[in-house]
Swiss-Prot record:
Gene3D superfamilies: von Willebrand factor, type A domain. Pfam families: VWA. The lineage of its organism: Viruses, Viruses incertae sedis, Bicaudaviridae, Bicaudavirus. Transmembrane segments: none annotated. Residues 723-892 form the VWFA domain. Keywords: Coiled coil. Residues 143-162, 185-196, 536-546 have a biased composition (Basic and acidic residues). Residues 553-620 form a coiled coil. This is Putative VWFA domain-containing protein ORF892. It comes from Acidianus two-tailed virus (ATV). Residues 109-548 are annotated as: Disordered. Residues 129-142, 467-481, 512-531 have a biased composition (Polar residues). Residues 169-184, 212-223, 287-300, 324-336, 425-448 have a biased composition (Acidic residues). CDD domains: vWFA. The keyword Coiled coil applies.
């Protein structure tokens, strides 16, 4: 059941200049509010009145906001309102609206908070679809290259050692890593060896880049730049990164690189045959995930840069580090080893993530970074992994020494941990894909500063590695996971060892790249991935677990609109001082003090002073407000009435209690006690109607019902206003038409009142005749005498019988005389009334509360002046129309 159109028209009559223009808006609003009205109106007697009021009051309150909200949000808001009403139907609609809007805003805010996680879980759908496609193609190419590189690596494992020069240790490590990679390939797959061989080849070709990549990867264990470098040059850089990690281990363990190589070899052999200590885990991971990495090098390159590619990167990094310089590479590798060692435990924790990422969770870790890094890594491989590794390591070279010291210290720790799984390289490899990307992008730029960038990365790892590993892993480690889930993943990472390292490095890289730099940008990027994907990938606001709007701007707009609506509704709380409402139970309770009763009625008086505020809430025009105020406050004296209640409430309360509780029930149709009626007579208003003034919602109802005459009032008792006594002049001058008209007047009056009031008739001339009921018209006619005119004696006789009826009259006539309150004199004669008779007449009138109406038929000024001495009202009428004049006065 919808609201009728006439209700709509009435609801908007105050401000609808053209009803046709507003009809569409009105209908839309009614469709929104009608289900709410039908639920809430059960508490009210008249749905139509409540609908009018609600539409009147909330149209401008709600509609401007409804226009801004999507339809599904409007539907949710409607459900919230109805749920609030059904949960507590006794609360005011103001509270209902405030709570419903608040809950809807909170629900959207919660979904907005959950959205970044969802965005991280499915980032490739929104941002990196192209990159993913490129990765697939590049991964195929890289696989082909790796096949060749593996063969070359098998042929030239010693060349890497020779190319390393003083970094022969790293070269040996590269060979060992290659061998260990082969072993891992044997155990886990040939992919890690292929990557190692590719890394060695790339490292030989890139030389310094491999060192930088190794350093970057070692730093990647700590810094996101290294992971980015390794990932950006996955074909070269990732392999180099892993090689760098391996070199980091090698440099520390044997001439920092040679040692790292030996350790990596041992780590590979002991740590699942991984390439390096860092690669031991990474190698294991790479061995496990190399299949995945080779399949999707871009995705795996990001994490394989921290995982499977770490083996190849370790070899390449070793070879490149060998070409770059034993010292810089060794320092970088030592820093990397320290970082790797630091990242060992962390990477172990993250290894679970890394494995997950390797298994396809790589996009989950840092989808944007992995995609970008993979794209950049592929580009770096195509352009030459050297550039990626070189750029990535350029900045690290400065901090390489510092990171070396820290890396060495950490490397010692990691050596112990490397035997358990060599998570160091994984931490390096776990660096964020942004680092690999950045490394791939800036590889050529930092070729010269490859060692510096590596050192810088290691320094970042040494400085930020530990905290960033934890924080970043949680923030960006999985890219989708929350901090808590990431922490749990880190714990699980210790078990999986390999996968989490890549994610851990990615997360570390995220923290280090949080400031948009390689070391700081990834953190912000990781944290912003959800927002970025939200901007690009959302498909609009949806219910339940579905995605939100396509952009945070739209969501913020909705939240802002709901906030404005919530504030608007809550502004009604300014009327909370009305809460001390007059409560009928308070006055029925004998234990309530008189002071409290008086105080509550004073609150009612205060409401009258705020009528103007209430009218403003109705959104009526200023002219209409003034009109209503004038009617309520001035003409009907609402304020004075409430003031009188405050001072004389006892009489009112007695009146209400005398009527009984059933009287109040009668307004709800109980049928008990005296019936009630609808009207605007405030003197007979039920006290519960006054209680409406305590609530801002019901205040409007009170005003609307008052204007429409729909207030519940006591049905007045049918009090008889008294009988009529006609004193008719029957002198000779009244003969003819005058006397006939004069006798017809009481007959018509009797017929009008249908016996509810007795009509008595007395005729007079020189003397008054007996008084008869008009029903005995024959006796009236028989008593008529046509003679002179003695007005004074006739009126005095009638008043004396009203005061004390003659005993000769029957009982009914005497009772009727006692109830007579109106005396009507019809005469056309002029007479002098003595003063003593005039005084007695006036005295009896006052005593018996009798009203004397005198009609002078064709009388002159002198005759009218005589009548004014005794009459309350004197009318000069003509003989042709006096009948109608008298009847109009008496009947209407």
């Amino acid at each position: 059941m919808s609201v009728d159109q006439d209700v709509v028209d009435e609801a908007y009559q105050y401000y609808a200049e053209d009803k046709r223009q507003i009809s569409d808006k009105a209908r839309k609003f009614i469709e929104f509010i009608d289900p709410i009205l039908r639920k809430y109106s059960k508490l009210f007697r008249y749905y139509q009145n409540f609908a009018k009021f609600t539409l009147e009051y909330y149209y401008k309150l709600f509609y401007p906001f409804l226009e801004k909200l999507p339809e599904n949000v409007v539907e949710d808001l409607k459900r919230q309102i109805i749920n609030e009403i059904m949960s507590n139907p006794n609360q005011s609609i103001r509270d209902v609206l405030a709570k419903a809007v608040q809950k809807e805003a909170q629900r959207i805010e919660e979904q907005l908070q959950r959205r970044p996680q969802r965005a991280k879980q499915q980032p490739q759908k929104t941002k990196t679809s192209e990159v993913a496609n490129q990765r697939v193609s590049r991964s195929a190419e890289n696989q082909g290259k790796r096949g060749n590189e593996e063969k070359q690596q098998q042929k030239t494992p010693g060349k890497t050692e020779e190319a390393s020069g003083a970094e022969q240790e790293s070269g040996e490590e590269g060979n060992q890593q290659e061998e260990s990679g082969e072993e891992q390939e044997g155990v886990k797959g040939s992919r890690s060896k292929q990557r190692e061989e590719q890394e060695e080849e790339v490292s030989e070709s890139e030389g310094k880049q491999s060192e930088e990549s190794g350093e970057s990867e070692s730093e990647e264990g700590q810094s996101s730049e290294e992971t980015q470098l390794s990932s950006s040059g996955e074909g070269n850089q990732q392999e180099e990164g892993k090689g760098g990690e391996g070199e980091g281990a090698e440099t520390e363990e044997g001439g920092r690189r040679g040692e790292a190589e030996s350790e990596q070899e041992e780590g590979e052999e002991t740590g699942n045959g991984q390439e390096s200590s860092g690669e031991a885990q990474n190698g294991g991971e790479s061995g496990e995930s190399e299949g995945e990495i080779t399949e999707s090098e871009s995705a795996s390159e990001e994490q394989t840069g921290s995982k499977g590619k770490s083996g190849q990167q370790g070899e390449e990094g070793q070879q490149q580090s060998g070409s770059e310089g034993e010292e810089g590479a060794e320092q970088e590798e030592s820093g990397e080893e320290g970082n790797q060692q630091e990242g060992v435990g962390k990477q172990k924790k993250r290894s679970s993530r890394g494995q997950e990422s390797e298994a396809g969770e790589e996009p989950g870790s840092a989808p944007e970074e992995t995609q970008l890094s993979s794209g950049e890594e592929e580009a770096g491989q195509e352009s030459g992994g050297e550039t990626g590794s070189e750029q990535g390591f350029g900045e690290e070279g400065e901090q390489g020494q510092e990171s070396e010291t820290t890396g060495k210290q950490k490397g010692k720790k990691r050596e112990a941990t490397e035997s358990g799984g060599g998570a160091e390289s994984e931490s390096e490899e776990g660096q964020s894909p942004e680092e690999t990307q950045e490394g791939g992008e800036g590889g050529a730029e930092t070729e010269e500063g490859g060692q510096g960038s590596e050192a810088e990365g290691t320094a970042a790892e040494g400085e930020v590695g530990q905290p960033s590993e934890q924080g970043v892993s949680s923030s960006t480690g999985s890219g989708q996971r929350s901090e808590g889930s990431e922490a749990s993943e880190e714990q699980n990472a210790g078990e999986s060892g390999e996968g989490s390292e890549s994610e851990g490095a990615e997360s570390i890289a995220g923290e280090q790249t949080g400031s948009s730099s390689e070391s700081a940008g990834s953190e912000q990027l990781g944290s912003q991935q959800g927002e970025l994907s939200l901007e690009e990938g959302g498909r609009g606001y949806a219910h339940g677990d579905e995605d939100l709007l396509s952009s945070p701007q739209e969501i913020n707009s909705i939240l802002q609109t709901l906030s404005q609506l919530r504030d608007t509704v809550q502004q009604l709380r300014n009327y909370d001082f009305y809460s001390n409402a007059i409560d009928e139970r308070t006055f029925d309770d004998q234990n309530v003090s008189e002071h409290r009763k008086e105080k509550e009625i004073e609150n009612l008086y205060d409401t009258a002073n705020n009528v103007q505020k209430l009218l403003k809430d109705l959104n009526v025009s200023e002219g209409e407000q003034n009109k209503i105020l004038q009617e309520l406050v001035t003409q009907y004296s609402l304020r004075r009435l409430l003031g009188n209640i405050a001072t004389k409430y006892k009489g009112l309360l007695d009146f209400v209690r005398n009527k009984g509780e059933s009287e109040v029930e009668s307004r709800h149709g109980s049928g008990k006690g005296p019936s009630s009626t609808m009207g605007d007579d405030l003197s007979r208003l039920f006290i519960k109607e006054y209680a409406k003034l305590s609530n801002p919602i019901q205040q409007k109802m009170f005003l609307l019902d008052y204007l429409n005459g729909a207030l519940s009032i006591h049905k007045s008792e049918e009090k008889k206003q008294g009988d009529f006594l006609f004193v008719i002049d029957s002198s000779g001058s009244m003969e003819g038409n005058k006397i006939a008209t004069a006798l017809a007047i009481p007959l018509v009056t009797y017929k009008k009142y249908k016996g509810k009031r007795n009509i008595l008739v007395e005729t007079f001339s020189d003397e008054p005749s007996p008084i008869y009921n008009i029903k005995n018209i024959a006796n009236v006619l028989g008593s008529m005498k046509f003679g002179g005119t003695n007005i004074g004696s006739a009126v005095l006789y009638a008043l004396k019988n009203i005061d004390k009826p003659d005993s000769d009259y029957d009982r009914k006539l005497r009772e009727s005389l006692r109830k007579t309150r109106t005396l009507i004199l019809l005469t056309d004669g002029e007479d002098e009334i003595p003063d003593d008779i005039a005084r007695e007449i006036n005295s009896l009138k006052k005593k018996n509360k009798v009203e004397l109406l005198c009609y002078g038929i064709d009388l002159g000024e002198r005759g009218l002046k005589t009548l004014k001495e005794i009459c309350d009202e004197v009318y000069a009428v003509g003989s042709n129309n006096f009948g109608n004049i008298v009847l109009k006065r008496l009947v209407h």
